[in-house]
Amino acid sequence: EAMHGETLCLTGKVTDCWQPVDGTQENASFYLKDLSIEADASSFVFSGDSAETTDNLSQISGSADADQMSVLISSQKTTSQINEMQEIFGKNASALCYLQEDEALPKAGSYVRVFGEVSPFLQATNPGEFDTAAYYRRKDCLFALRKTKITAQTKNYGRLEEFLSQLRYESEVLFRKQLGEKNGATASAMVLGRKKGMDSEVKALYQGAGISHLLAISGLHLSLIGAGLFGFLKKVRLPVTLSAGISTWILIVYAQLTGMGISTRRALVMFLLFLAAGLLKRTPDLPTSLAVAALLLLVPKPQRILDAGFQLSFSAVIGIAVMIPVLQDGWEDVAPSLRVTNRVTDGVAGWNLVRAAIARACRFLCKNILAGLGITMTMLPFLLIHFYEWSPWSVLLNLAVIPLMGILLPCLIGLQLVARLTALAHCLELPQHLLCAAIEAIFSCYEQLCRFTTALPGSILHTGYPTWQALTAYTIGLIALAVSGKKLRPHLRLAAAVC
């Protein structure tokens, strides 16, 4: 807080650029990484109103060592504070820079010299309030720099990073142009992971109904894209190794396009292990893949374990790997037994077919409800810790919305491809309109389902932050059910799970 309003001059590497899609520069921002400290501010000379372009890093930093960046500051007091913070965060420390309205975004991957006003992130002062400082602390971000002005920039920049940055921006603009502001912003969140600018009502509606996970790039997205692409390449008779290589490369690029969040990294690692197991003709093991993903994420940065995305993503997969088998085992034999015997209809071929179809539908419905319940059981403590509320109806709602994602996501990606080709081939206008109509219909369906669910009695349970005693008791019960659950009859397992 003591640094608030201090004017700093920083140099570092530009990453994660964000530009508003309305064409203005309001809230345009980027992260500045590879920071280091230089206490002597006398070496900084501001050379004019416009940014100078230099050939190499040493000309920007004023240092002979091109591998080191300098932070030129206005007071020794600020220097000691930054030094102390950087020692805590390590060499990966960064700053979030918000540009002045008349400034253009620098190229991603370039090194720049900037100056602006320090704005520390706010800490939570009330229970339940979002802790901005803790959120950015886990991202190794020291502070925000407001009214940022760029005074120098290297000619060299990251070609792939800049391409992905421009592709992300153009894709957001295209979604809003084709689908309108509200649906376009929702589509950008689902496909690109860009929630900035999303309609606040829609965002609150999804969260209240318990389907906000659709707005996070996770295993659902990567599995649909990766598995779909891998299967398609095999169907066109490409070699399995080549199909896996192409799928891997496209998934890695897509993960970078969407920001490479924690849930995305977890899903990417697990999918790559799944592909590797197939190539080696081994059976993929879900718990092993999950453990490898956790190690790769936590070893370089242990504080990630406190991140909400990490906890929710991994707890969901734990539910799939551990709780779903416990709940589903044995229920295949229950649905067929729930049949009505009738002397008139028994033995009639048509009725037997209908009864068999009903039995299959019951088994399918039971398995999916139990799958949703199993995932919810492991995620529930973290949902209450981070959001202080839970929607019991979300278990049933997800039975409808998740299968629709298998249609929605390919339509959204297809719209990006078709809309770009329509300028060259006008015959694609009809497919483009059909894709837009299908997407808008699914979004409308989502919205109506959410409104219906939130209108039901007990749609949202406001629990507040759970006590450690409640969390401990719940965890012990969950472990006991996971360990000894298969020894119980299916009806008792379900009763224990609900309790």
Question: Could you describe each region identified by the protein language model?
Answer:
Residues 1-213:
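Membrane-interface helix/helix-cap signal primarily in integral membrane proteins
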Residues 3-7, 353, 357-377, 396-399, ...:
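Functional transmembrane helices that form membrane-embedded active or gating regions
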Residues 12, 116, 190, 218, ...:
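Divalent metal-coordination and catalytic microenvironments
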Residues 152-162, 208, 384-400, 412-474:
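Membrane-interface amphipathic/re-entrant loop segments adjacent to transmembrane helices
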Residues 159-161, 165, 191-196, 258-264, ...:
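Hydrophobic alpha-helical transmembrane segments
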Residues 160-173, 327-330, 334, 344-365, ...:
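Short helical patches
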Residues 199-394, 463-499:
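Hydrophobic alpha-helical transmembrane segments in multi-pass membrane proteins
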Residues 326, 373-380, 407-414, 445, ...:
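Transmembrane alpha-helical segments that form the membrane-embedded catalytic/substrate-channel core
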